[in-house]
């Protein structure tokens, strides 16, 4: 009976130990993210990094934009009638519409895509006269019904159609030179007329063979008009092909011809560098945006988007992914409901997380004579948040650069070049998608490792405070060997705990409690001692009975040698 009472009393002493546990925030249903080491890591919080939402409008608030409407960018240089309002000007955003008109008289512009992109990337156009003069037998006022202006026949505003003043008269040999006296390069564009018939050619330029030469220090070419009927376009069977080049500062360009030249009247100076947009989206002057694409505007602070690989402005990088989740919380270990055993339902971070701890990432739960309690640790929480705050912004800084990729429409002669460019863009997209996945996975790994590290730092801080006044249970908790009321628990949490104040009480309780703690190591020892003691007592009883019987003559022992 004595032994039973002692064991019950000692177990009561063990049960009476005060206890403090460290834990971290957890949620019932976390978010799955990718890390370097795990394809499906559950975290408490995550944010999307890929923008999938488009504004179906061009947000132009605060921008000095020029909407070309039906005018093609090339038409701004040659003076197509529909482009009359756009021959000069400055802008920070140039908007090109589909089905815009480049030529009124049928024809084509050689290297049109390269020319178009130069215009779309510019921030303005100014014009300077070439100063060309012509003899009295030449008229520079050729017109056509294909280029109507104000209800009458007209021509390109920036070009002169040179023809013989007298029908059928041979066009005289003519030479004109333009010198660029500016400090910037000038863009000069001219045309070659290909008559639809010999009769048309003879009426305009005479019966002689036609030849045009254009020469500068960087450009030389000779052209021969090709006579022949073509399918009618805008009522015309003839064609005008346009050519262009850049005249460097201090350089001259010379035109020599005897008919068939569409001569430049003014040269263009492209200034600045700004945005060019191809889009059919409507303009909205009430919203702002820094990124545009064919479908409208992309207004986002996210580092990636999956709307289009062809965007202009300060845009997120295009990735071929629907979603890339960036971890903004710690590893999630949902709380396991504890049965109320010897130490109640309190458990530490090594077993599981704590749900319901909404005021911090890390915290404490304690149990003492006054009951149980929970409190967040703001210092470690803030340390973790400081490292995660701005993580999305840092990701944006690593990926967002002003990037312009104007969608191209290639002619037949440029088709192979177009294929190469499109293949290159697809390859870049694949590379960026891989880079984005790797970058997000690295950031997620860092976030989780950092959060785990802060948890361990907090645990180490408490362990160093308690020293020998408590014992670790291996599950994230400390069993305290002295009475620790709520004030004492608060001192442990805020790092003001005085170890020496409780040393004597803790030492005494440790000596009283440790001998009877039935941990796995001591349990076997106690069992062996108990077995040995029982055997000894049994042997003593048997021997006593033998001696008693021998003494009374009830038993005789004969020893034979």
Swiss-Prot record:
Disulfide bonds, paired cysteine numbers: 21-477, 59-287, 71-83, 104-147, 291-315, 484-488
Glycosylation sites noted in the Swiss-Prot or TrEMBL record: 29, 45, 252, 422, 494
Keyword Metal-binding (UniProt): no
Cytoplasmic domain ranges by topology: 546-561
Record's keyword terms, sorted: Clathrin- and caveolin-independent endocytosis of virus by host, Clathrin-mediated endocytosis of virus by host, Disulfide bond, Fusion of virus membrane with host endosomal membrane, Fusion of virus membrane with host membrane, Glycoprotein, Hemagglutinin, Host cell membrane, Host membrane, Host-virus interaction, Lipoprotein, Membrane, Palmitate, Signal, Transmembrane, Transmembrane helix, Viral attachment to host cell, Viral envelope protein, Viral penetration into host cytoplasm, Virion, Virus endocytosis by host, Virus entry into host cell
Main location as per UniProt: virion
Highest taxon, organism lineage: Viruses
One GO term of the biological process aspect: fusion of virus membrane with host plasma membrane
Locations listed in the record: Virion membrane; Host apical cell membrane
Post-translational modification: Palmitoylated.
Described purpose of this protein according to its UniProt entry: Binds to sialic acid-containing receptors on the cell surface, bringing about the attachment of the virus particle to the cell. This attachment induces virion internalization of about two third of the virus particles through clathrin-dependent endocytosis and about one third through a clathrin- and caveolin-independent pathway. Plays a major role in the determination of host range restriction and virulence. Class I viral fusion protein. Binds to sialic acid-containing receptors on the cell surface, bringing about the attachment of the virus particle to the cell. This attachment induces virion internalization either through clathrin-dependent endocytosis or through clathrin- and caveolin-independent pathway. Plays a major role in the determination of host range restriction and virulence. Class I viral fusion protein. Responsible for penetration of the virus into the cell cytoplasm by mediating the fusion of the membrane of the endocytosed virus particle with the endosomal membrane.
Name recorded for this polypeptide: Hemagglutinin
Gene that encodes the chain: HA
């Amino acid at each position: 009976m004595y032994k039973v009472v002692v064991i019950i009393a000692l177990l009561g002493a063990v049960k009476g130990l005060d206890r403090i546990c460290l834990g971290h925030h957890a949620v019932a249903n976390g978010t799955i993210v990718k890390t370097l080491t795990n394809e499906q890591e559950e975290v408490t919080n995550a944010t999307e990094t890929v923008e999938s939402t488009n504004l179906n409008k061009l947000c132009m608030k605060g921008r000095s934009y020029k909407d070309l409407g039906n005018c093609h960018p090339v038409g701004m240089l040659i003076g197509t009638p529909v482009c009359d309002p756009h021959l000069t000007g400055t802008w920070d955003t140039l908007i090109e519409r589909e089905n815009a008109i480049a030529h009124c008289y049928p024809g084509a512009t050689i290297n049109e895509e390269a020319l178009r992109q130069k215009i779309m990337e510019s921030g303005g156009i100014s014009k300077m006269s070439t100063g060309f003069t012509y003899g009295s037998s030449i008229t520079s006022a050729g017109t056509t019904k294909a280029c109507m202006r104000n209800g009458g026949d007209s021509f390109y505003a920036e070009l002169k159609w040179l023809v013989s003043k007298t029908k059928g008269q041979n066009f005289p040999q003519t030479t004109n030179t333009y010198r660029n006296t500016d400090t910037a390069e000038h863009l000069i564009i001219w045309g070659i007329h290909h008559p639809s018939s010999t009769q048309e050619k003879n009426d305009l330029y005479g019966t002689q063979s036609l030849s045009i030469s254009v020469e500068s220090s960087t450009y030389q070419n000779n052209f021969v008009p090709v006579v022949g009927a073509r399918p009618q376009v805008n009522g015309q069977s003839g064609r005008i092909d346009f050519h262009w080049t850049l005249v460097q500062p201090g350089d001259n360009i010379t035109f020599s011809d005897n008919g068939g030249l569409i001569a430049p009247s003014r040269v263009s100076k492209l200034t600045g560098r700004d945005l060019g947009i191809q889009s059919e989206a409507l303009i909205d002057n009430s919203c702002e945006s820094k990124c545009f694409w064919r479908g409208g505007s992309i207004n986002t602070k996210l580092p990636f988007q999956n709307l289009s690989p062809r965007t202009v402005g300060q845009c997120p990088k295009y990735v071929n992914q629907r979603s890339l989740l960036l971890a903004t919380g710690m590893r999630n270990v949902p709380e396991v409901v504890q049965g109320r055993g010897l130490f109640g339902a309190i458990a530490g971070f090594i077993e599981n997380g704590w749900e319901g701890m909404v005021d911090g990432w890390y915290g404490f739960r304690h149990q003492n004579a006054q009951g149980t309690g929970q409190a967040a640790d703001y210092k470690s929480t803030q340390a973790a948040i400081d490292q995660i705050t701005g993580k999305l912004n840092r990701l944006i800084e690593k990926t967002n650069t002003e990037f312009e990729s104007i969608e191209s429409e290639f002619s037949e002669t440029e088709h192979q070049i177009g294929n190469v460019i499109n293949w290159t863009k697809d390859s870049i997209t694949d590379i960026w998608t891989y880079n984005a996945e790797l970058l997000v996975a690295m950031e997620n790994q860092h976030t989780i490792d950092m959060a785990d590290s802060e948890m361990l730092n907090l645990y180490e801080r408490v362990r160093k405070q308690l020293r020998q006044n408590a014992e670790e249970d291996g599950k994230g908790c400390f069993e305290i060997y002295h009475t620790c009321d709520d004030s004492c628990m608060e001192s442990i949490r805020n790092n003001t705990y005085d170890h020496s104040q409780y040393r004597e009480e803790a030492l005494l309780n440790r000596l009283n409690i440790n001998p009877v703690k039935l941990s796995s190591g001591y349990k076997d020892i106690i069992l062996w001692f108990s077995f040995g003691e029982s055997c000894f007592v049994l042997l003593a009883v048997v021997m006593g009975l033998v001696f008693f019987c021998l003494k009374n003559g009830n038993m005789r022992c004969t020893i034979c040698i």
